[in-house]
UniProtKB/Swiss-Prot annotation:
Residues 197-230 are annotated as: Disordered. Coiled coil: none annotated. It holds the Pfam family MHC_I_2. One of its GO terms (cellular component) is side of membrane. This is Retinoic acid early-inducible protein 1-alpha. Glycosylated. The gene is Raet1a. Residues 1-28 form the signal peptide.
């Protein structure tokens, strides 16, 4: 049992390192841009009626904060507000519909209540990368109560689970054609607005804090901003992440 838990954590660590590797590479490219949406689905209570929350960031700039209680759209630069609003408005309804669908799926998913401690808590991270010469694609990461993990790649419509237990849930979810369609077409429905905003030059915020841990990737805090000096720093970070990835694989053996 303990070995299985450790193996599960290793799989999750490797999965996060792969995402970090992707960001480390694209952050080293001057023309690389990204849209990231963090979704949270949880059980509401009388004291806290919040059951879903969505935050979307473009190149670390928060453009949309949406929940079943309120909605806020913002941009880091007044000159970008109009375009950020267009992106936020386009994403709002699809995200609302998706969160409702996710809530239904979590409610109907059988999980080990000892692992989930009651109603499952779902975290979903969508990452859309855009870089010249590369095909734009989105990656969806699913984390159910820090116990079940799986990923969907829209580029080749493939799924990957962290372990067998996660695979059981993943296979049921991927057989839902309507659900998969929502994941696949969320970005294409707003592709024009998103791409236009991503193409705009932006003054990205500088970070004075240390790099986030792997577990912070699924939180609502922004990712570390790219370097503006040279692409060399980006490739150095890739090398460090790659070394960490090798260690993770070694421990998982």
């Amino acid at each position: 049992m303990a070995k299985a838990a450790v193996t599960k954590r290793h799989h999750f660590m490797i999965q996060k390192l792969l995402i970090l590797l992707s960001y480390g590479y694209t952050n080293g490219l001057d023309d690389a841009h990204s849209l990231r949406c963090n979704l949270t689905i949880k059980d509401p209570t009388p004291a806290d009626p919040l059951w879903y929350e969505a935050k979307c960031l473009v190149d670390e700039i928060l453009i949309l904060h949406l929940s079943n209680i309120n909605k806020t759209m913002t941009s880091g630069d007044p000159g970008e507000t109009a375009n950020a609003t267009e992106v936020g408005e386009c994403l709002t309804q699809p995200l609302k519909d998706l969160c409702q669908k996710l809530r239904n799926k979590v409610s109907n998913t059988k999980v080990d209540t000892h692992k989930t401690n009651g109603y499952p808590h779902l975290q979903v991270t969508m990452i859309y990368l855009q870089s010249q010469g590369q095909i734009p694609s989105a990656t969806w990461e699913f984390n159910i109560s820090d116990s079940y993990f799986f990923t969907f790649y829209t580029e080749n419509m493939s799924w990957r689970s962290a372990n067998d237990e996660s695979g059981v849930i993943m296979n049921k979810w991927k057989d839902d054609g309507e659900f998969v369609k929502r994941l696949k077409f969320l970005i294409p429905e707003c592709r024009q607005e998103v791409d236009e905003f991503l193409k705009q030059p932006k003054e990205k915020p500088r970070s004075t804090s240390r790099s986030p841990s792997i577990t912070q990737l699924t939180s609502t805090s922004p990712l570390p901003p790219p370097s503006h000096s040279t692409s060399k720093k980006g490739f150095i970070s890739v090398g460090l992440i790659f070394i960490s990835l090798l260690f993770a694989f070694a421990f998982a053996m």
